[in-house]
């Protein structure tokens, strides 16, 4: 019989606010809210500290409303370089216990500690070690769920906050999980929760006890998936951190980002696509490749993922051409049933930059060489003086979305159960 898995889900508590308080001890135990631009009252709260939350301040709340709830609140501008650095520190701690670490944004990650138990103790004991280490070394807290699969582990980390460990096993999961709202389950967004409500399915227990055929009829294949999750049937593996075959040839180069707020307009999407295309193009040049195709992946606020790709008329390593192709795919295939939460851009069908290619009549080798020299020069400036030393004008249209070094902040996202479902 296979050994029962020990899966952990670690969730940093009020992550942005916690990083600010760790970096600025004078803010500790005070009501603070991290926001994009404190000078703009049209801005929103990205994260609030627990003292602010107790006063009614919530994520996504306009700043003027947050101040009505909490008169002495301190608004702090977001510092994504700081949060990325802290995120890297947490992952270094996780990797002391297992190489199977699957990040979920900057502040969450799954760990498979099954094989680590002989060295470090039970899953619960490892969770305690990680929690204590994060607190001692970084000055922030995390909540950890321990279970036999990823779904239950995530429900465990959400169950008690802050600074808590919750074990959900096969013996107690119905008692703990079944009374929880169905919306707490992974992949149940607002629209899906509303549909379930219409069928008197209000809790995870209700979902688990509903006939799977009925759920499939009403929700499609996601209905069966949710039924399995509600019943603890999740065998999805935890990916190895930055898993790659070192000796294998590079077949594609990509970057993805979970944005600090939902993307609601074409301009939002263009800014993020261009940001990612810059990173992908720079890595193509660094590795001496051109790409003959571009792939875009979109994840909406319900966590559904779909991917589309297209061939290019000519191989390229230019960010403008990659961004334009990605935006074309997005415009053609995405119809805004939900806001977007994450975007990925990938250069595919690679060829060495020394390989000759067939050109068209309107192709200008001189113009291509000029653009490639320009972008290589920008790479050199950024390598010496930092990413933000040179930026495109489009990046100043929304600093909240564009203030990210996509190469440094690259995040691995979990495997999409619902690839191609949109």
Give short role names for the model-derived ranges.
Residues 9, 192-340:
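DNA-contacting surface of Y-family translesion DNA polymerases
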Residues 28-30, 71, 140, 290-294, ...:
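A generic structural signal for short beta-strands and their flanking turns/coil linkers
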Residues 36, 298-302, 349:
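Short acidic, glycine-rich loop/turn motifs
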Residues 1-228, 238, 282, 365-422:
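Gly/Gly-Pro- and Ser/Thr-rich, intrinsically disordered tail segments characteristic of DNA damage-repair
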Residues 109-115, 307-310, 352, 357-363:
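Short, hydrophobic beta-strand segments
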Residues 321, 327-384:
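C-terminal hydrophobic structural anchor segments
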Residues 104-108, 147-150, 289-293, 338-342:
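Short Gly/Ser/Thr- and Asp/Glu-enriched loop/turn motifs at secondary-structure junctions
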